[in-house]
Amino acid sequence: MYKKVELPKGFVGVEKEVADLWKEKNIIKKNFDMNQDGEYFTFYDGPPTANGKPHVGHVLTRVMKDIIPRYKVMKGYKVIRKAGWDTHGLPVELEIEKKLGISGKPQIEDYGVEKFVTECKDSVFTYVSMWEKMTEQIGYWVDMENPYVTYHNPYIESVWWALKQMWDKKLLYKGYKTMPYCPRCGTSLSSHEVSQGYKDVKDLTAVAKFKVKGEDNKYFLAWTTTPWTLPSNVALCINKAYDYVEAKQAEGDEIFILAKELAPKVLGEGFEIVREFKGEELLGMEYEQLLPFVTPTEGKAFVVVHGDYVTLSDGTGIVHIAPAYGEDDNLIGKQNGLAFLNLVDLSGNFVEEVTPWAGKFVKKCDQQIVDYLKEQNKLFKAEKHTHSYPHCWRCDTPLLYYPKESWFVAMTTLRDKLLANNEKINWYPDNIKNGRFGKFLENVIDWGISRDRYWGTPLPIWECECGHRECIGSIEELKTKGINVPEDIELHKPYIDKVHLNCPHCNKEMKRTAEVIDCWFDSGSMPFAQHHYPFENKELFEANYPAQFISEAVDQTRGWFYTLLAISTAIFDRNPFENCIVLGHVLDKKGLKMSKSKGNVVDPFEVLDSQGADATRWHFYTASAPWLPTRFSIEDVAETQRKFLSTLWNVYSFYVLYAELDNFNPLDYKDFVSDNVMDKWIMSKLNTLVKDVDDHLNNYRITQAALEIEEFTDELSNWYVRRNRARYWSEELTDDKIGAYTTLYRVLVTLCKVAAPFVPFITEEIYQNLVVNLDENALESIHLGAWPEVDEKAIDKKLEEKMDLAYKIVKLGRSARNGANIKNRQPLSKMLLSTSELPEYYGDIIKDELNIKEVELGADLSKYVNFEIKPNLPVLGRAYGKLIPAIRKEIASRNQMELAQKIQNGGVEVITVDGNEIELNAENLLVTMQGLEGFAFAGEGSVGVVLDTTITDELREEGHVREIISKIQNMRKESGFEVADKITLYVAENDMLLDVIKKFEDVIKKETLTEEIVYNGNADYSEAKVNGEILKMAVSKRA
């Protein structure tokens, strides 16, 4: 009736068989087509780049993104799960540069832009097969046959439409600003790109001496972390509200001007203040040019100005200003009409006028500049300083802040709307809203979207010599306004650059501006561009916007999460998603960041091939909250497999084994209702589980849901099945046995449905054998079914509480046994419980589980246990020295057992002593709980248990019997006997144990299906250790 439950190739083998089944029956497509008349639940899949290999972080994002859509389909929603590929931008271009052995824009143009772009296009799916394999292997169900691709013309056209919307709203403009610039890639970057590339670096810093004009021996001291900017200095900036001084060092006659508060740190001991004054007095003072390679001809230069941003946190209180190389500097320059001196070319090298370092990369000249200043007596001091410096997020080159003409989206005008839309988003964890993400929005700057590169969505703006500009928002508009536009126009460079427009003002030809756009604009446009909106699928987009759910790694707070919100706010003034789970980083088994240089990168395929997808998924769901860092290794996943999957599998295997023996078909007992207390308890727990997990997943509490499933499965195995084994072993198919079978069957099937979104493979395997295998009318896959209904009538909270208490007492009893080093197979005479309310049924369970003869309720455990609670004097004494005697007295007045257990379990007890409210906890109290001689104790909360550990001769004999039965069962298993096989037992040599066996022969025979016991007969004996005694034993199967 049932397929035999085996794991010849482990769980990985099961998963391969299940994957084959899904393919054979087209289950994934059928799942996608479910609930066509249902309400939409919208999920957006953030697009990865397929020109790079997937890593273990991508496994995390995919398993987290998979679970909610699966769950929502089961709840009756129609869910579109469209995969996407991010195909433009620097990541692709850099790979092609490596492939071709070229570097930088000049070599690209020498190679040929058309050929280069073709190479880029051909490369974007280099690793797509690897991505598809990983996606399939982990069970991430997303439509990869019909993905959105950012380089396809329809997608680009939708992006153009978005840019045209911004143009029409006067949000898109061209400006000349100092921007973060990558000299290696030859393009400026946006603020959200820059935020992803900061690194702590140790750079050379310098305090330079700027000679006051008209003074022989007086200098301004200004500190800089970028000595390479000093040749372009045109001003010094102070804060007019601060106090400044003229001061001398202990040795020397030079007078230095700097902030008073920073003088001790800068000048050292023994300095002398010559004069003290407010910073305002310095405004307008002039100084001599520090490095006079080029003298500016326009604007003010070499003058002291004011800036609010100057602080006293470090440096000298005087900041050197080079408007060409910093946002703050540029702003100060504009406010004060300062000269603009740019001495660095687009490759990041000094121009030829800077003769000592002409043609050299500026960041490599810091030491040479410092040495030069020292030779010229213009250096006060130089030292290494660790600070955070931006690097290119793709090529890792240190960025320069460089003056460039670029196209911008005026995000600063939308700041209030961005913040308002952010308030409508539920973030998990919620501190992202007003923390990492909210702070970024508060400080938002205009988005520089143009890139001086080649492979990307072309900026659809055409310019005329007369100054007229037009933004094109569709292919149709391009064909209408363009000159000889090909019917099948390719929208990329260099083809689009050949398309000219007629200028409506002067009738000359307009040319497209050369830039492409930030590839993050592509991915941020996916809510509408994936549907080619507004040119197609208008109703589909509107029904699926905004998304109910997205999830990506924490880095995307500065990336995709931001660009989604920025574009959506600019165009629709709406939040583009409602719920977002932000994922933490994946670390190695030691908690360290994975990196190739450390050699600690875990290959996701290695883990999937050895441990399987379900184990990997379950590890990510349960190891920690999704937003916290997760340690990941093969060992971690193997432990997850053992703890949960193997437990579930063993319960399933147990059911099939005995149901097959009895030829039990649950379909014959659909309406059977069991009145067994254990059956009622597990059905109550099951329905509570269905209800709780439903609530958790509906509120995106994935880890809580998974842990509750894991706890239930543990109780199912280690309590329900363990307590009910004898019911399955009985010879007759009684109502009690039918109740045991039907209950376990219903629990397994429902548990698999609840766990299906988490572990889709093992649940399918169990469902196929328990449901499809028996019922020809069953749905052909568990993933085509609905979420199980909750039977509220089956939930009995009082029953759950009583059984949970009994289970808790049993676990405490086991703990007490372990503490006393007494096996559970050794019977004991008595257990004493602090609790006084426990029905007889549960007392019998406890006695049976713990192998105890008697349970005494409501016992005063203080008679058997030494509770000692003392103040931890180094802690409490330091805070309440004189009150210690009174604190001791107050502690002694409490119930010592309850207080001791409360503190040991992390609780807090509040006492009041002489009007002082004092919190007592594990840090300021010393607690010991030790059973007296002949007793063992364990406790948790208000529940305590004491075992009488005195072992009489009679108890010892019973212990020997239980140990012998255990050895026989192991021998049966090792011999490969079936559960129902009858055996002959051979025992020899130990007279004491042989006498015990004879005394308890009937018990041993019944427990082990032994028909005959042969004493000292001929057999192929092996030695067994029975409580320190050696017994020779052998078993043989009866004919």
Swiss-Prot record:
Alphabetical list of CDD domains matching this protein: Anticodon_Ia_Ile_ABEc (cd07961), IleRS_core (cd00818)
Biological process annotations from GO: isoleucyl-tRNA aminoacylation
Motif ('HIGH' region): 48-58
GO MF entries: aminoacyl-tRNA deacylase activity; ATP binding; isoleucine-tRNA ligase activity; tRNA binding; zinc ion binding
Residues binding ATP: K596
Motif 'KMSKS' region mapped to chain: 593-597
Enzyme Commission number(s) of this protein: 6.1.1.5
Principal localisation: cytoplasm
Cofactor: Zn(2+)
PROSITE patterns: AA_TRNA_LIGASE_I
An annotated GO cellular component: cytoplasm
Compartment(s) where it occurs, according to its Swiss-Prot or TrEMBL record: Cytoplasm
Domain notes: IleRS has two distinct active sites: one for aminoacylation and one for editing. The misactivated valine is translocated from the active site to the editing site, which sterically excludes the correctly activated isoleucine. The single editing site contains two valyl binding pockets, one specific for each substrate (Val-AMP or Val-tRNA(Ile)).
PANTHER family referenced in this protein's UniProt entry, alphabetically: ISOLEUCINE--TRNA LIGASE, CYTOPLASMIC, SOLEUCYL-TRNA SYNTHETASE
Function as written in the Swiss-Prot or TrEMBL entry: Catalyzes the attachment of isoleucine to tRNA(Ile). As IleRS can inadvertently accommodate and process structurally similar amino acids such as valine, to avoid such errors it has two additional distinct tRNA(Ile)-dependent editing activities. One activity is designated as 'pretransfer' editing and involves the hydrolysis of activated Val-AMP. The other activity is designated 'posttransfer' editing and involves deacylation of mischarged Val-tRNA(Ile).
Quaternary assembly: Monomer.
Descriptive protein name: Isoleucine--tRNA ligase
Organism: Clostridium perfringens (strain 13 / Type A)
Taxonomic placement: Bacteria, Bacillati, Bacillota, Clostridia, Eubacteriales
